[in-house]
Every structure is written in structure tokens, then in C-alpha cells.
Amino acid sequence: MSDTIAAISTAQGEGGISVIRISGDSAFTVCDKIFKGINNKKLADMKGYTASFGKIVSDGEEIDEAVALVFREPLSYTGENVVELSCHGGIYITKLVLRAVLDAGAVPAQAGEFTKRAFLNGKIDLSEAEAVIDIISAKSRSAARAALCVKEGAVRNKIDEVKNLLLSTAAHLSAWADYPEEDIAEVTDEQLYDSFDVSIAILDGLISSYDSGQAVKQGIDTVIAGRPNVGKSTLMNLLSGCERSIVTDIPGTTRDIIEDTVIVGDVILRLSDTAGLRTTDDKVEKIGVDRAKHRLKQCGLLLAVFDYDRSLDDDDKELIQSAGEVPCIAIINKTDLDKQLDTEYIESKIKNVVYLSAKSGDGRAELVKAVEDIAGMDNFNPSEGVLSNERQRQAVLNSLNSVKDAKNALEIGLTYDAITVSIEEAITSLLELTGERTSDEVVDRVFHNFCVGK
């Protein structure tokens, strides 16, 4: 990391300001070549967390006015000397300022290189680095909160608690076994069980957070299904907030799957409005119906729509049967009309039932609550730490299984050496999660998803 790197850190386009970030041992030297403060004070002589207003000059020509923010190592984002130049937000001007910085001795930063340097310099662990990209890409309040809590150490604190407990246990076991001549107190089975049970509870809690975390981060693959003209497209439009699906009184209008992503309460739903489920001789419509039936078997949430003013038919009953195979909310639509539907039968077969008028919006709040309940939002507590990706989940799961192996070894009377092997495997998995012990390939894969300038 001998190079001093630079990149535009704000989004491309025209705006009030743009920020060019420079990081590395020579950050101050590079910037002093092109930044001339109005008080003639060099950035290299300024204290950290201070700012200076001045001119950007290249080849003796003034390019722009700018504010330079100075951060001294190690008290900066990257842990290195950092300068952030805030100039006017024009596309051409911003690129001109960056070119001047590069001409002064900096090199272009790679994607995610600033955050990668923060990781390599011990400012953040790998889970916190992954949280940075999650903050940037968050599509809902819950997703942003969850990512921010991870960035501030919610997952790391849990991992450190388990890691330190297991390290202490393994060290005590090894010392007692290797130095019998020393006056080292023997570890009791009760102490070992306590250590394992506490570790298992914490790791189990993190594993449980994963599904809710994915629901708020990636969204739930959700299918709207029902027979023709029950109001599926109207429901799709209600949730989308716009006329996304065609709404008519003609059965079979929706022949293919229409997709949209919406935020319902604090949950992201990846919605699919499917063809009406019915027996048909129309070849094109039949293809749509077959696709709908296939899709609803694979979804993470089924919104099964029924018509309040029509009696149940065989297609409705087939849908009710499918509802037992996936998480489901039964939506009794058109409640503004006269009742003909056997709602008691539906309530006896499907746990979550919501009464709604998709046309007027009455009942929408109840639908939002039902979606949040199915997504586990009642138990969703970002401050407790939320695993945000499969890499983290697998590392915690591996550690959990190793702790369970250690507990099982104790229960069947294996030696302390055998127990210690499982404990050490559990610790290794946790170190892989934090990045304290992991391959360069894994690290590179994490930062590959970042944008340039972050």
C-alpha cells in the first residue's frame, strides 16, 4: 500500500459539490502541489479534522475553488493520511480536478480500495466492510438500519464475545493438560457446558437473524395468485403505487408474469402478478397459467387472492392447497361488495387472512402488518447484529457446528485434546468471518462489489 490513491467519491453527474478523496503516505504532499489555501498554509502543516478554503491550480492555471478536509493517520477512514477535496459538482470540473491530483503523483484507486485499506489497516473487520456496501445499496429504512448496526460493530461484538470465551476455554484446557506440574485448576464439566451453551445461544441467534436480514436487504420473492378477475392486478397496482398491471373486467388479461419491487412497511417484496388460475383452452393463456403454478411453488411468499362476492370454485380450492406448501397470506378482496365467499373455510385452512378492498385501499394497513409478521419483523432487532450474506452465515454455521461437536465430545467422554480440536475449529470459522484469517481470494471477492471512490 505504498501508493497514494485518488478517486471521485461522489456519484457521477452534475450537483452542488463533488468530492475527490486522496489517501496514502503522500496525500498531503500530492495535494499541496495543486491546492493553494487562502492563508497560504500547507495541508501538511494542518491538524487533523480541519478544513481550508482555497484554489485548485494545475500548470499555473486556476481550475476551481475547493475546500480541503485533512485527516491524519490513523484517525481517518482508511487509517492513512487522507485529504478530501470538495469542488464544484460539474462533470468536467470534477474530472479536471482529479486529473490534477493524479498528475501531482497519486494513482487511480481501484473499486473499493479505500475501504479495503481500512480493513487491511485494522480500522474495520470484513463484516463491517461488507456493511459499507450494504449501507450504500440499502432500499429501505430497515435495510439501512441493519447495515449501519453491523458497520458499528453489532456482529463483530457478538463474534468477539464467542471467540474470547472459546479462546479462554481452549487455553485453560491446554494449560491444564500440558503442564500438570503447575498449580492450574482443573476445568470442570459444568464450566465447559456453560461455555458451550453460551456460545451456542449467541451463534444460534445470529443464524436466526439471517432470514429476516435477507428479507429487508434483498426482499422476498412474492407471487400474487388467484383465479381471473379476483383483483390481482389491482392489488399489484395498490402495492406498487402506480398502474403497473392492466386492470379490466375481461378474464385472462394478464397472460404472462408482471414483476415489480415494492416496499411494504419495512419489507421489500419482489412482486410477481401472475395469470389467473383457471382451466382454459386458450393455448397462450394456458402457458401463462402453467407458469403461474410453477412460480407459486418456488416463491418465498404467496399472496393468495380470493373474491369476497364469489363462491369458492375448484381453482380456489387448488390454490388453498398450494398455500400449505409456502408462507402464505390469504387476501379476501372486494370487501366493499356483498359476501358470497365461504371465508370460514379459508380461515380454517390458511393461518394469515386479510380482508381488503384493493380498489379503495381499505385494509392495506392490515396487509402491511401481515407481511411484516411473516417476515419476522417483530423479532427483527438490528442492534443485536444481523448476518447480511451467505459468506457470514456459513462461517457462523460452521462455528456453531464445531461448538456442538465439542459439547458432544464432552458428553460421550472424549479426551480434552479431542474437545480442544473442535473448539479451535469453531474459532477458525469466526476468524474467517471477521477476516482475521482468510484467503486473499475471499477478501478480493468482497471488495470486488464496491464502487470506485469507496
Each PLM stretch: what is its role?
Residues 271, 305, 331:
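Generic enzyme active-site microenvironment
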Residues 285-309:
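Inter-motif core of Ras-like GTPase G domains
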Residues 2-8, 12, 143-260, 280-282, ...:
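C-terminal-of-GTPase-core extension/linker across diverse P-loop GTPases
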Residues 240, 275-276, 300, 307, ...:
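Short glycine-/small-residue-rich Rossmann-like dinucleotide-binding loops
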Residues 52-63, 68-72, 252-280, 298:
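Switch I (G2) and immediately adjacent beta-strands of P-loop GTPase domains
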Residues 1-145, 149, 153, 329:
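A glycine-rich (often HGG/GG-containing) alpha/beta subdomain
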Residues 269, 301, 329:
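Short, Asp-centered acidic motifs that coordinate Mg2+ and/or phosphate
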